[in-house]
Amino acid sequence: LPLVLYGGYAMIFVGVTCLLFSILYTTRLSYIGMGDILVLLFFGLVPVTMTYYLEMPMYMQGFTNEVIVASVACGMVIDTLLIVNNYRDIDNDRRAGKITLVVSIGPSVSRRLYLIVGFFACLMGLVFAFMGSYWAFVLPAIYLFFHVITYRKMVKIDKGSELNKILGETARNIFFYGLLVSIGLLL
């Protein structure tokens, strides 16, 4: 409710939409491969753009390229967590009829997708560099070091509960990415 007082009635729409899709995800959407798209939307675009909307003065309300790039990049980095989770659960999901992206493309391509999604999230930072925020591109590149190490471990483990360690490392990497982008944008 305080967000509505501060951000206006648009925040009611955002809140209701988030609630609706969180419910739909637990029912049908996760069974038809929509998880990755929903992560990009509701862990990337919605929180980053709405935070910008709430924090910027009314006369600066237009969304900038930096905001859109940051939101997509955040969604992509967070999607790596969903990829690992679905990779770990691929056999159970297949048996349950849950057609995640990982089930659709198989384990081999999914492992590469994990690596590529993290790489492209960092590559999106080039937009920051072209707009003069050089450090917002350079610092998040440190994330790639940890991301590649985690990927190499993931490939060796392949499947099972040992992948829980990879989930933890991926969550840590996401934290590093967010911290490094934030510091880079402040410099």
Segments from the language model and where they lie:
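Membrane-helix interfacial "entry" motifs
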Residues: 7, 28-32, 58-67, 132, ...
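Intramembrane alpha-helical segments
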Residues: 1-58
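Hydrophobic alpha-helical transmembrane segments
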Residues: 12-16, 37-41, 67-72, 111-115, ...
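Functional transmembrane core segments of multi-pass inner-membrane proteins
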Residues: 39-90, 109
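Membrane-interfacial segments
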Residues: 33, 54-59, 88-92, 132-136, ...
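Transmembrane helix-loop-helix
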Residues: 1-26, 116-160
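Interhelical loop and helix-boundary elements at the membrane-water interface
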Residues: 21-43, 90-115, 151-180
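Hydrophobic alpha-helical transmembrane segments in multi-pass integral membrane proteins
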Residues: 49-59, 175-187
